[in-house]
């Protein structure tokens, strides 16, 4: 959905149910920028952020805590999570970006001067989060008076940030420079932790000994809920200023003031009188404090865990719990047949670039064997090594092979959305063949332990609608390996936009020593080891007709990407390949029946040419050049969490190459 606001008019796109929030936001602009004329080009947070805040408050009041997820289709309404507008548009978006470490511009920045678009987008989410934190600090009733006074005082006027701050201090009768300086002028984050909770008994009186730590640089007053053994709860307020910022109920206990900022005085302990032994403590049960790591906001050694079914489409992480998604899974191969099992995906606030305690894997029962099929992957960020740096481990055990890899990955970038950026990965991997009966006859695998050091460097660029990436992979055997070899490959992919889209891929590889056949790069596609790691191929060997596999009709993208029938039995010393393809749809749209058949079926035609020049182990060089056409259709029926799949048929005719024959191939993945 997309929309634009005008006084007494909104222009909106999209459909149900997403348009509800969009419409609410654009209508909200009639108050903030329409009636209260803040200058969006100067300080956008007064416009977009205030509108985001009132949109969340109004929508959550009208539709409840599922206001942002009004699903209508059966599957979505049954299995998708229900979330509030406050969560979707404010808390989640701000917290994810703040956790990345790339928030470099404070809210109090001219709209034209933000480092990148993602930093600018914080004027929406972070501002609304700031106002919810102000509500938490002053109390809901006081903040309502602040907003009403600000609105009425600057109706049809042009206020600036200092005007709102002055109103907030006047209405609340509190000095709030400490609050607004943190939220508007800095990029520091809020992160508190409960480090210890003990139950004490002194002279027949019960006390809760509570220890806290401020891990982030931002300071805020704290509301903490204590749960007692007798079932009662007690609220504790820890002020950070000389005077409480809000009125508290008489039943609340006001603890001593916690004075501290940045790393100064970042620990705190208090003894709270209670009526019964304490069993649990929780920071901010209202969920308004934008603490970027809430797993330690609850006492105990094991953090809260949210067990839920995996709908395979939409994931909204729980802000105050570790998510575990479960679903059934299965695999199929020609030896074991059907292998049922369970798949899990877990982590804290998972996203595309910062995955904390991310674990994913499956356990399947092999019907023809006593041992299970197991896959396990784990990664977590290591912040002291730099933004977007993760360590990872990957383990696989199947009837065909077993492998284990451990390493680290880091991205070097100027921002989340900024190009170019670099991706560097270093790992150690070990693998071995368990049984050759799982592979098709044309695949050559060798028994023995393969142990290697792997280095990878990727460079990614974008300009306009064109994108590209260049990836260098280096692999060398290490002690303990039964094979002594070295391998270097360079892969480039450039997706260019002219009058027709033009995709150009190049592959260059060099290898020496006793390269295991399953690791060796190939003319027709990816290496055998990389191929069997693709679930669709591993299962397809038993599902597709024998003619498909025995005659190379199944194409695994990679390597030289040749589609004509050209099988070599000896290893290659080096290879250079160029793959060029284009989608000629714009030329075909005027053909009779194109819209009714090709376009309606969502089929994408491709025209491609491939050139390969290589040397085999006998020092013989050969060249093959082919051309062909293909048809590709997205398999949208498969949930995106299972991967991006297509149905692809390519037909190739050799133009030059003495041993090549025309051929057709089938695949469930794109060429590149």
Which sequence ranges carry the predicted segments?
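Solvent-exposed beta-strand/loop surfaces of large extracellular or lumenal domains
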Residues: 232-267
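Solvent-exposed loop/turn segments connecting transmembrane beta-strands
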Residues: 156-157, 329-342, 347-354, 360-374, ...
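Outer-membrane beta-barrel strand-turn architecture
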Residues: 138, 172, 332-334, 348-351, ...
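C-terminal outer-membrane beta-barrel translocator/porin domains of Gram-negative envelope proteins
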Residues: 330, 387-399, 403-410, 421-427, ...
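Hydrophobic alpha-helical and helix-loop surface patches within well-folded domains
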Residues: 1-221, 225, 229-232, 281
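Outer-envelope beta-barrel architecture signal
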Residues: 322-326, 336-340, 353-359, 372, ...
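Outer-membrane beta-barrel initiation region
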Residues: 232, 270-273, 284-384, 414, ...
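Outer-membrane beta-barrel "beta-signal"
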Residues: 628-629, 661-672
